[in-house]
A protein has these predicted regions:
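Glutamine-centric residue-chemistry signal
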Residues: 32, 188, 236-238
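N-terminal regulatory/effector-sensing and dimerization cores
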Residues: 1-98
Length: 269
């Protein structure tokens, strides 16, 4: 069964077409980004030709974009990120640019969408609005790079946002919340945050959660499942994956390591 997940202003959906087919003309109410995962897929626009997608090509469709879908021989599998109007209003940076359909044969646009798909397929519990907004900012920033501005000096709000995430990594913050507090567009916020701190906002939040979990694991006797929830992870498996990415060690092994007080030699420094 195709995978689907609705979170706040977003819908993440997989579509599987097993056979060659030409669908009748249709249009959707909401803007969306589509990634062709495998197979052959083409959108036919009456009177305007068509756009043929190869695997890992990404496309954008504005609301009410009338078209027909043609699935090639052997079928196709696609991933779509749908934006409710509130999300579209926050993120789509140039009305003129986003009023027409777009197609990108570009890894920087495709890979954040692909990461959302792999999370949907393997660990949907780890997805939340903050992570989705961070990935969407990557997509839009790459697709619209020639319209993005770069800061030459570190804005004060970068450190303010960093402190907000560090102080409350387990909270319900969103990228759009932090951008609004900074007085900048969400795409500019995410790009500038990474420019000066070297990581995406969601990566920074992940590290802050791991740090909180480390403190709880060594200073309390809470079961690791409760440590995970207290630090903001969806569950213990979510925390274990994050520990592996950030520290290269499992939470249980980290706790055991720091609770082993046997002397290993003279103290240094």
């Amino acid at each position: 069964m195709p995978r689907r997940l609705a979170i706040r202003d977003f819908l993440l959906a997989e579509a599987i077409h097993r056979d060659e087919c030409l669908y009748p003309e249709h249009a959707f109410a909401h803007a969306h980004f589509t990634l062709l995962l495998k197979g052959s897929f083409e959108e036919v626009v009456p009177g305007r030709g068509s756009r043929h997608m190869r695997p890992l090509d990404a496309a954008f469709s504005p609301p009410s974009f009338a078209h027909r879908d043609r699935v090639g021989r052997g079928g196709a599998r696609l991933f779509t990120l749908w934006l409710q109007q509130s999300a579209a209003d926050e993120f789509l940076v140039s009305a003129d640019f986003w009023h027409v359909p777009r197609l990108w044969e570009s890894a920087p646009v495709a890979l954040p969408l692909l990461r959302l798909y792999t999370e949907l397929a393997t660990a949907p519990q780890s997805l939340d609005p903050f992570e989705i907004e961070d990935r969407l900012a990557q997509v839009i920033g790459s697709a619209h790079a020639h319209h993005c501005t770069h800061e030459t000096r570190r804005p004060r709000w970068v450190d303010g946002a960093r402190e907000r995430i560090s102080d409350c990594p387990h909270g319900a913050l969103r990228v759009t919340d932090l951008a609004r507090e900074a007085g900048v567009h969400p795409v500019h916020f995410a790009r500038t945050f990474r420019q000066f701190l070297g990581v995406r906002p969601a990566e920074y939040r992940c590290r802050a959660r791991v740090a909180m979990a480390c403190r709880l694991a060594t200073s309390t006797t809470l079961p690791l499942s409760q440590v995970a929830l207290a630090a903001g992870f969806a569950d213990q498996s979510h925390m274990t994956r994050a520990f592996g990415r950030v520290l290269g060690i499992a939470p249980a092994a980290y706790r055991a390591l720091l609770r082993d007080d046997r002397s290993t030699g003279p103290a240094r420094g």
